[in-house]
């Protein structure tokens, strides 16, 4: 017997699981001018994610990590170009754009993506993922150009990431909150399991690659130093530090447990950041902001940056709002030298031995 419920209008409707397909169609029904292109694009992305997840889950049985990364890029391109929803794609793996070829119809959306973030850790069974960002093409019907993609993150229509871990998950925002879907392999569909995700406000966790400490600017050194000082320091509480070198894993942890993740600017002006603005920073920033958190460069909002190049890099600091705002405040204070490293007895904050 189907699991049914009576609606306010007296109609009988299914009350079962909400799949990604049903979710996106219901979202589109709220817009009278909707053509169905957007839900079609999301379904194509979901199909690509399922294929990539199957390859990743096979690990070394399928291919080495570098071949998996190339294969993931090919899957994303192949599954999204033919449906008539896109004008072009831009992959972090290729560095350029791929226009929808004839005879396929060109749509009104642009897709920027990182096909397999964290692929370097696959050989040690670490979680990897796919990050994507959807924009509207500024010149519908015209041959797409790289310049069409150079829009600030505030122009994103949709952003999300897939996480290939113990479960395959798809985290998504269309500008109205963040929802998490888990792949149910029995039915072959993504099912809503984490509705209306919110970044916890109170947190005592942070993530940063301490191997790059020598490149950090003074405000970042100050923030990390205060966290490491624990109860005896100015924060008067103990913090937990972690680092997995997987942006998607860190982003999911932020959405579920709170905290702050830092990919800070380097003191070297020739390297302003370590992550791609269009393919990684903007989509993660959109998700975090829609979940009530904050994402920035340490000095300002990530999504307000005006990209000059498709491969432009940027710093990224994201997580619980209060922690990100504290880091921004430290960057705004004059001097930026208030942190005294001698409190830790050695030049590094991470004491040896």
Outline where the language-model segments fall:
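IMPase-like, lithium-sensitive Mg2+-dependent phosphomonoesterase catalytic core
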Residues: 1-63, 68-89, 94-353
């Amino acid at each position: 017997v189907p699991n049914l419920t009576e609606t306010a209008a007296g109609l009988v409707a299914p009350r079962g699981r909400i799949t990604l397909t049903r979710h996106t169609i219901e979202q589109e029904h709220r817009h009278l001018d909707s053509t169905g292109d957007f839900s079609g694009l999301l379904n194509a992305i979901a199909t690509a994610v399922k294929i990539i997840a199957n390859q990743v889950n096979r690990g070394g049985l399928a291919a080495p990590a570098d071949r998996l990364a190339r294969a993931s890029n090919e899957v994303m391109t192949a599954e999204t170009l033919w449906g008539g929803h896109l004008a072009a794609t831009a992959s972090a793996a290729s560095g350029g754009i791929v226009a929808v070829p004839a005879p396929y119809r060109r749509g009104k959306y642009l897709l920027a993506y990182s096909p397999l973030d964290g692929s370097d850790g696959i050989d040690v069974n670490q979680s990897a993922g796919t990050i994507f960002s959807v924009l509207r093409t500024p010149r519908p019907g015209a041959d797409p150009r790289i310049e069409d993609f150079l829009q600030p993150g505030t122009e994103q229509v949709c952003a999300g990431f897939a996480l290939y871990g113990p479960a395959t998950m798809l985290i998504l925002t269309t500008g109205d909150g963040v929802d998490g879907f888990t792949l149910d392999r029995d039915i072959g569909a993504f099912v809503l399991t984490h509705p209306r995700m919110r970044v916890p406000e109170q947190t005592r966790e942070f993530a940063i690659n301490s191997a790059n400490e020598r490149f950090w600017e003074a405000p970042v050194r100050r923030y990390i130093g205060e966290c490491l000082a624990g109860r005896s320091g100015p924060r008067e509480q103990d913090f937990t530090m972690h680092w997995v070198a997987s942006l998607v894993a860190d982003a999911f942890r932020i959405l579920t447990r709170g905290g702050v993740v830092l990919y800070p600017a380097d003191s070297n002006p020739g390297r302003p950041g370590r992550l791609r603005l269009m393919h990684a920073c903007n989509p993660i920033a959109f998700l975090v902001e829609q979940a009530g958190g904050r994402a920035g460069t340490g000095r300002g909002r990530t999504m307000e940056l005006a990209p000059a190049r498709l491969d432009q890099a940027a710093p990224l600091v994201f997580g619980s709002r209060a922690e990100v705002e504290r880091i921004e405040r430290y960057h705004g204070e004059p001097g930026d030298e208030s942190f005294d490293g001698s409190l830790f007895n050695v030049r590094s904050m991470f004491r040896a031995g």
